[in-house]
Amino acid sequence: MPKMKTNSAASKRAKITGTGKVKHVGSAMRHNLEHKSARKRRELSADDVLRGGQAKKLHQLLQK
């Protein structure tokens, strides 16, 4: 049976850390940043860690 392909869209958007957590870049940092405070921009710039069902689904898509 052939190998399963990794989902390309998921692999571009998420990464599995060494401990097995799923990390992805959050939203709200593309434009309209001038009205957000420096504190808010700093908080939003950090990568998010997915939990629960979303993490489980991405593990299946990335096959790890």
From Swiss-Prot:
SUPFAM superfamilies: L35p-like (SSF143034). Residues 1-64 are annotated as: Disordered. Keywords: Ribonucleoprotein, Ribosomal protein. GO terms for biological process: translation. InterPro entries: Ribosomal_bL35, Ribosomal_bL35-like, Ribosomal_bL35_sf. Residues 54-64 have a biased composition (Basic residues). Residues 1-10 have a biased composition (Polar residues). GO terms for molecular function: structural constituent of ribosome. It comes from the Bacteria. NCBIfam families: rpmI_bact. Belongs to the bacterial ribosomal protein bL35 family. This is Large ribosomal subunit protein bL35. It comes from Bifidobacterium longum (strain NCC 2705). The lineage of its organism: Bacteria, Bacillati, Actinomycetota, Actinomycetes, Bifidobacteriales.
